[in-house]
Curated annotation (Swiss-Prot):
Pathway: Cofactor biosynthesis; iron-sulfur cluster biosynthesis. Its EC number is 2.8.1.7. It comes from Rickettsia bellii (strain OSU 85-389). It comes from the Bacteria. InterPro entries: Aminotrans_V_dom, Aminotrans_V_PyrdxlP_BS, Cys_deSase_IscS, Cysteine_dSase, PyrdxlP-dep_Trfase, PyrdxlP-dep_Trfase_major, PyrdxlP-dep_Trfase_small. This is Cysteine desulfurase IscS. [2Fe-2S] cluster binds at residue 334. GO terms for cellular component: L-cysteine desulfurase complex.
């Protein structure tokens, strides 16, 4: 339930990696396609269909423009999870009789890892690359992992939990030289950081609508035409979307995604400046008032709308309860129901105790200075209170190594 405090609406939304609010301009663009412009974009015999088809094609062009692609290379899906599945399984099924090896990274989104595990059960060999303590892959390890059987490398652009940006250009160069397809889940980076599919030699890229102030239930997959990339569809039917994804297209949602992409294209610089300023303000204020706070992931090679912080000596779940006026997460929204420490943090080598204390704060287009000020004040007072109550924090301050303690069992 929302409450108001000095013009602040509580709780304050700081979970922009899980989803983003719909930009009012996106809502406005979508509305006519729910009401008067309701035609099926595949109906070729009357103006209702033509009108819807024109809207779909305009959106396709706006999405392509944002990543330096051609409109025909954009295939509409229900979201990034479907796009990731279509890219990975689609390549494996189409090229599987020639090659049988895929490379991905231990810190990928769960849907990429699960799609790969599914293929492993079908006999595909999968290599899961480790990440360095800063969250970024080692390019030499990638190079050495590629064999003559490798058909696909899948590495995300921006990590959903820690916000680090992987070196896409360098990865793309390696893949192109070795004749391997390169897929990237760009859902967290699309419209937020500059990504050019040609500069980065990306062959397939997964996009989500609700991560860029667009609607939920819509996404896209970029599939390169030159040199041509072939995939086997997951869904068969009327042959829409160049035969790669059958089904009637949801015109209102597509218009929403196209509008969101167009806004991002025009306002990325402004959004980046805003987010970077609030990131620096938030982090500097927290660090100046609380000790032993750790930023997870590389400080520079990252999207600054994502701050994953570990607060030594307090449990992440108790922090979330203490700061309930802030809508935050202790990891990916897809796995935050589990109390296991984040697999992304563990794969970076973050100590299990510290991984349990991590909170992901999201900053976005609609975050205000006033909200950041309130958040900092609340976090600092609650962390200090929780640490005062924590015998573990007291022991840490006395220099006791918690790992060496033998706890009695009752």
């Amino acid at each position: 339930m929302n409450t108001q405090l000095n013009n602040l609406i509580l709780p304050i939304y700081m979970d922009y990696q899980a989803t983003t609010p719909l930009d009012p301009r996106v809502m406005e663009a979508m509305l006519p396609y729910f009401t008067t412009k309701f035609g099926n974009p595949h109906s070729r015999s009357h103006s209702f269909g033509w009108e819807a088809e024109n809207a779909v094609e305009e959106a396709r062009g706006d999405i392509a423009k944002l990543i330096g692609a051609e409109a025909k290379e954009i295939i509409f899906t229900s979201g990034a999870t479907e796009s990731n599945n279509l890219a990975i399984k689609g390549i494996a099924k189409f090229y599987g009789n020639k090659k049988n090896h895929i490379i991905t990274v231990v810190s990928e989104h769960k849907c990429v890892l699960d799609a790969c595990r599914h293929l492993e059960q079908e006999g595909v060999k999968v290599t899961y690359l480790p990440i360095k303590p800063n969250g970024i892959i080692d390019l030499e390890v990638l190079k050495n992992a590629i064999t003559d059987q490798t058909m696909l490398v899948s590495v995300m652009a921006v990590n959903n939990e820690i916000g680090v940006i992987q070196p896409l250009k360098e990865i793309g160069k390696i893949c192109r030289e070795k004749g391997v397809f390169f897929h990237s889940d760009i859902a967290q980076g699309f419209g937020k950081v500059p990504i050019d599919v040609n500069e980065c030699n990306i062959d397939l890229a997964s996009i989500s609508g609700h991560k860029i102030y667009g609607p939920k239930g819509i996404g896209a997959l970029y599939v390169r035409k030159k040199p041509r990339v072939r995939i086997t569809p997951l869904i068969n039917g009327g042959g829409q979307e160049r035969g790669m994804r059958s089904g009637t297209l949801p015109t209102p949602l597509i218009v929403g995604l196209g509008t969101a992409a167009n806004i991002a294209y025009n306002e990325m610089e402004k959004d980046t400046k805003h987010v970077n300023h609030l990131f620096d303000k938030f982090l500097d204020a927290i660090n100046s008032q609380i000790s032993e706070v750790y930023l997870n992931g590389d400080k520079d090679q990252r999207y600054k709308g994502n701050l994953n912080l570990s607060f030594a000596g307090v449990e992440g779940e108790s922090i979330i309860l203490a700061i309930k006026d802030l809508a935050v997460s202790s990891g990916s929204a897809c796995t935050s129901a589990s109390l296991e420490p984040s697999y992304v943090l563990r794969s970076m080598g973050v100590d299990e105790e510290l991984a349990h204390t991590s909170i992901r704060f999201g900053i976005g287009r609609f975050t205000t200075e006033q909200e950041i000020d309130y958040a900092v004040k609340l976090i600092c007072s609650k962390i200090n209170k929780l640490r005062d109550l924590s015998p573990l924090w007291e022991m840490m301050q006395e220099g006791i190594d918690l790992k060496k303690i033998k706890w009695a069992t009752h």
